[in-house]
Every structure is written in C-alpha cells, then in structure tokens.
Amino acid sequence: MKKTRVINKRNLSTMIIGMVTIAVAIVCVFLYVSKPKQTNKSSQSYLNGVDVDKLQKKVGKDFEGTYLLKDYVVYGETLSLYKSKYGSTETDKMQGNNIVLKNVMTDATTSFTFNGSVDSGVDLGTLKEGIYELYTYNHFEKERIYFKDAFKAKAVTTMRRDEKVTSVSFMADKNALKEYGIQFKKNYAFIIVTSQEPNEDIYDVVIDPCGNAMNYFSNTVDVGASTSVLDEASSSLEFAKKVKKELEKKGLKVKILRKENETPGYYGANGRPARAYKTKAKLYLALGASLDENVYAPYMLTSPYTNSGLANTVSYFMEQNGLTLYEARTNTTQENGVLYDSYAESDNGKVLEYELYPQLRETGGKATYAGVYGDEFKNVDYKDAYGMYGLYFSYASAMNSQSVTYYNENADAIAKILVKSIVRYFEI
C-alpha cells in the first residue's frame, strides 16, 4: 500500500507564506525593471503624448509676415534673440521688441520684452508645458520668427520649483514636426517645454567662496583679502555654507565649488568656472571680500551685459529688512549697493568688451564672452556655452573693521535675505 505523506498545518502555512513572498519578489523585480529610468524620462518630450490630429489642425503653417533672426543667447533661465550675430552691433534691431509665445494647443499667449540685456527676453522658468510658436512685431505687424539655417539647440533644464523642473527645447527647423505629418516652408522657431522629475546630476545654484585661487600666470595661490580682521578664504567658505543651507531649505540643489584646502583658479579643466558648467547650474553666486578701506557694508557686482535685475532685487529686500548696503551704484537704474563690473582696456586705452571679474566674465558663457579674454589659459570650451547668471556679493571689506563687525553681527540675516531675494527673482 502506497504511503501518503501528511503535511501538518504549520508546514502548510510556511509553504504558503514562502510562495507568496516569492510571488511578491517577482512582481517587485518586474516593476523595478519596467520602471522608466531617469535617463528615459529625461529623453521624453511633451510631443510624445500630444494629440496629433489637434496639433495638425492648430499649428500655423502659412503666415502673412515672417521675421528673420540670426542668433540667440541663453543666460541663466533667459533666452535672448538677435537680429544680427550676437555682439556684432552695438544696438541689435530686436532691442525694444516684444517676443510673443503662442501655445499651439491652448492658444494662450505670453509676451516678453527684450531690452538688449542678456537677462531680458524669454523667461524660460515661467513657461508651462507645451509647444510654442514664436512671433515678434515689425512696424506693428505680428510676424512669425524664423532662422535661415535649421538647428536644434541643447535643451535647458530649469531650476527646481516645487520639486519639479522643465526641459526646454529651442529649435528652428522646417522639419521639426515632420514625424507628425507637418512640414513648413521656412525654419520657423519653436519652444517645446516638457515637465520632468529633477535629475540629481543637475544643480540649480553654485557658490564660489572667493579666496585661495590658483593664479596660473604666476603659479602661485592668491589667498585673497587677508588681514588681521578678516581672512577672505575661510570667511567666504563659512558664509557659503550658511547660504547653501538656506537655499536648500527652499528646495534648491546647491554645490560649493571648493573645499577648505582646495585652491582651484578661474581657468582650465579644474577651475571654478569649469566645475560650475559641469553642474548645469543657472546661478553662479560668488561670495567675496573687498580691499577697499572705504567700504563699510556689503555691496554687489553684476555683469554690465545685464539689467542688474537680480542684484536690484537683493538690494530691495536687504533694505526692506533693515540691512545696510554700501552707498554706491553705477547708474540711476540700479538700486543702492549695486555696481556694474568694469570693462578691460587694451594697452592703448581702448575699452574692450571683456569685463574684469572672472567670476562674472568666465561664467556667463557666450553672453559674457567667456573663454576669449587674454592670451593664455582661456576657458575656450565654454565660449559658446549657455551662461549662468552671475552675481558677485561682497559681504565685507578686510580693510575696514566697521565693515567686518557689521558682517559678523548680521551674517545669518544677510544669508537669509540674500536667499529670499534669489527665490523671489527666479520665482521659485
């Protein structure tokens, strides 16, 4: 007679639990493997899920007037468009023009004014997901923007807002929508905005604690403004950590560009600008000290190619919150404590287009002529790069004990209001 093995209740229960555990594990592995990776998500476009029939009906194909442009610049989160090659004329014909973006699928329009500065133009950080046609006005006539040569620019990833970012693609190509059954007669310009999860390799802000910078010309380390009352290298790093902490509270990803014992300079593959460009940050915040004995409070330097928009915002909120700034400004369009960086001069006294501070010149990419000033050690890899919005914040003078005392007593408050201003300017 064949023997029958009897399974007791405890063994049966153990077997069932084991089978369920294995099944759950298989499902989890399947879900993990099939889950879209971050790189896959970043390759997706708004157009991947668009209603093709609706797109074909709504996108413009023929226009009464068209407007030819030749160049563009990206600075921070701003896209500026030019009638001539950037820098080839003193006043570009686009200056004073409105740039109108029309959302193809919703018909909503957004207008931006270009006043000639690289922080004016299309504010990419404010654009909602969608595909946009670009127009401008020529003698009060609305005309469709196009370029002679087709291109697709490198996508811009905007700063983190509510734990989200957008990927912004700018292109001009008669075949841009060919796969959707749409072709154009000219290389019309489009902007495509796609909502994405943040990529952990992309930062929002980089902070440069000034001082301890390698001078590649003399092969020595420039320690910075170092006196008996303030050491720029250590003070800047300490202040950078305060500012970083406040920025991170706002949901921004921040990188400090040097460690305590490092001495990176402003040129070459391991220089501070190179480190910054690799992060794809939108803001380059330099924190430094002055050697001017007349400076009794903080002030700011900004690129003369900008409107001083960010610096003006910082100045406004500093004074609104009872903080003192050094009484200085370059012109009446600037708030208190805001100065433009100076231009370099040639040997015969001719004013050049290059500004002096590498923290501003070498970090603004094409917009500030990065990589083209001087004869050696140029950052040539970044001369056509998208620029970071540069701000040099001088928190104290190492030659003025009153200034140092004021900074030491108010460093926390200054850091908080500086960050508040950045958040307000970029509408984080």
Predicted regions and their residues:
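Short helix/strand-bridging catalytic loops that position acidic/His residues to coordinate divalent metals
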Residues: 118, 224-230, 297-303
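Non-catalytic propeptide/linker segments at domain boundaries
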Residues: 107-210
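Active-site histidine-acidic residue metal-binding/catalytic motifs
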Residues: 184-273, 279
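Active-site-proximal helix/loop segments of hydrolytic enzymes
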Residues: 234-428
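Gram-positive cell-envelope targeting signals
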Residues: 1-48, 81
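Short, compositionally biased P/S/T/A/G/V-rich stretches that sit at domain boundaries
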Residues: 31-79, 84
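Extended low-complexity, serine/threonine- and proline-enriched intrinsically disordered segments
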Residues: 90-108
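Hydrophobic beta-strand residues in large extracellular and virion-surface proteins
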Residues: 79-81, 99-101, 112, 124, ...
